[in-house]
């Protein structure tokens, strides 16, 4: 049976998400993808509530085995880092309330899994993911967040077996 993995690229204005199906550890197929658009005119608290509500609905409908997020990283603007961290918290809570396992990877780890180099640009990730999964729609300028979400899900598909091995050795 195939495992369904959800990658999420969090944001305070756009949150990209993508689902992949993984069979026999190596066969990866795209399942579905999209983005949650949040209005800049809304107060931050309302955006977080909308993000929580929409992601909870998606999680309930799709019931993935795992949710994958980027680890927190520090922006040049400390306020942006804090706001993004709160969005990540909302996403972690939504998955946790539905008893879905959450995994986190550094952005450079996800880029390396998708492109082969950890310092790849967003456009390089977008191009490679669209080619690997044969999804031409990802090449649109406003789909970088979705491509990043696919890269995170693919990263977990590749690294999860090694995490299980690591746990068994400890």
Curated annotation (Swiss-Prot):
Keyword annotations from UniProtKB, A to Z: Cytoplasm, DNA damage, DNA recombination, DNA repair, DNA-binding, Endonuclease, Hydrolase, Magnesium, Metal-binding, Nuclease
Entry EC no(s): 3.1.21.10
Catalytic activity field: Endonucleolytic cleavage at a junction such as a reciprocal single-stranded crossover between two homologous DNA duplexes (Holliday junction)
Binding site for Mg(2+) 2: 70
Gene3D superfamilies: Ribonuclease H-like superfamily/Ribonuclease H (3.30.420.10)
Gene Ontology CC: cytoplasm; Holliday junction resolvase complex
EC supergroup of this enzyme: hydrolase
GO biological process: DNA recombination; DNA repair
Keyword Ribonucleoprotein tagged: no
Location within or outside the cell: Cytoplasm
Cofactor binding comment, as recorded: Binds 2 Mg(2+) ion per subunit.
Binding site residues for Mg(2+) 1: 9, 145
Co-factor requirement: Mg(2+)
Catalytic residues identified in the record: 9, 70, 145
Primary localisation category: cytoplasm
UniProt cross-references to HAMAP family, sorted A to Z: RuvC (MF_00034)
Role summary: The RuvA-RuvB-RuvC complex processes Holliday junction (HJ) DNA during genetic recombination and DNA repair. Endonuclease that resolves HJ intermediates. Cleaves cruciform DNA by making single-stranded nicks across the HJ at symmetrical positions within the homologous arms, yielding a 5'-phosphate and a 3'-hydroxyl group; requires a central core of homology in the junction. The consensus cleavage sequence is 5'-(A/T)TT(C/G)-3'. Cleavage occurs on the 3'-side of the TT dinucleotide at the point of strand exchange.
Protein name according to UniProt: Crossover junction endodeoxyribonuclease RuvC
UniProt source species: Chlamydia muridarum (strain MoPn / Nigg)
Organism ancestry: Bacteria, Pseudomonadati, Chlamydiota, Chlamydiia, Chlamydiales
């Amino acid at each position: 049976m195939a495992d369904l993995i959800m990658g999420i690229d969090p944001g305070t204005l756009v949150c990209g998400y993508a689902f992949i199906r993984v069979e026999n550890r190596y066969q990866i197929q795209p399942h579905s993808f999209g983005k949650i658009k949040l209005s800049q005119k809304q107060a931050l608290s309302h955006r977080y509530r909308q993000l929580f509500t929409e992601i909870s609905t998606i999680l309930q409908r799709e019931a993935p085995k795992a949710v994958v997020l980027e680890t927190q990283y520090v922006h040049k603007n400390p306020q942006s880092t804090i706001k993004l961290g709160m969005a990540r918290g909302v996403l972690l809570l939504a998955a946790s309330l539905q008893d879905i396992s959450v995994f986190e990877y550094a952005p450079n780890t996800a880029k390396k899994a998708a492109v082969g180099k950890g310092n790849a640009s967003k456009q390089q990730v977008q191009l490679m993911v669209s080619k690997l999964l044969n999804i031409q729609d990802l090449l649109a300028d406003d789909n970088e967040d979705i491509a990043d979400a696919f890269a995170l899900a693919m990263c977990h598909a590749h690294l999860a077996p090694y995490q299980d091995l690591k746990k068994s050795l400890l």
